[in-house]
């Protein structure tokens, strides 16, 4: 999906690859076949789900992953969590950052943020 087509104005940046995923529909975070694939053996095949809300926000769910899902170093429980720009999602040893895209120009020219878990603690 092109960043310009994103209705929510949010993107998720994967630290290990620098890939930016716009969040225009429900996406699964996990290994290999997931929409947001993370190359990390501590990540479950279907680890977590991120989805846009009708009010323009985002929500994150853990999918009963073996090692848990963390947001800003706090473990996500069984209830979904509303995300904000700047939140850092950690699955396994990998971090993903929530980015807010505020205008069409920014959507086209936003730099890619790449960070490892040890860089954000």
What residue spans do the PLM features occupy?
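Forkhead-associated
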Residues: 19-93
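Hydrophobic beta-strand positions
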Residues: 12-13, 63
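Short linear motifs in intrinsically disordered
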Residues: 1-5, 10, 17-21, 78-79
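Polar/charged alpha-helical tracts
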Residues: 17-18, 55, 105, 115
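Regulatory inter-domain linker segments that are low-complexity and enriched
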Residues: 1-10, 94-121
